[in-house]
Amino acid sequence: VKVIGSVGSQEKIEETKLNGCIETFISNDEKFSKKVLDVTNGKGVDIVFDSVGNDTFESSLSSLAHCGYLINFGQSSGPVQPVLMSTLAEKSLSISRPILFHYFGNRKNYEKMAASVFKAFEDEIIKVSEFLPFDLKDASNAHETLESRKGGGSIYLSLIHI
């Protein structure tokens, strides 16, 4: 599997390469789709995982190969506008909008999925970037960091220093 990364700023590119991306582009670059097509020799990618939503949706669709699959699993920039079926038909594209909680149908499935994720952490298949702790009293700063997409790591509120 070859992965092309998408980030919100130049500062995050190096981390994606350390985590195995063969190439990484800034998501709001107006030439994003063209760069993806260039890297794939004009084919496009088979799958796009898009957590941003409205701001990246069109470039995500444009980056797909024929019979490609777009998985929109978040909409941090706002909801995606309706898509015409004829747009999908141009390249026989598929789209899904999974909701994580729908996959937790029963306790057994939940435990199995959780175990596989924890195993991926143990085996360093999933690598954890830096953690950014904020005191609870600084929750507004944590939200600003999260909303600005400049955190670059996991943000959490600490109750220890109250």
Give residue ranges: language-model regions.
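Terminal helix/beta-alpha structural elements that buttress the NAD(P)+-binding lobe
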Residues: V1-L159
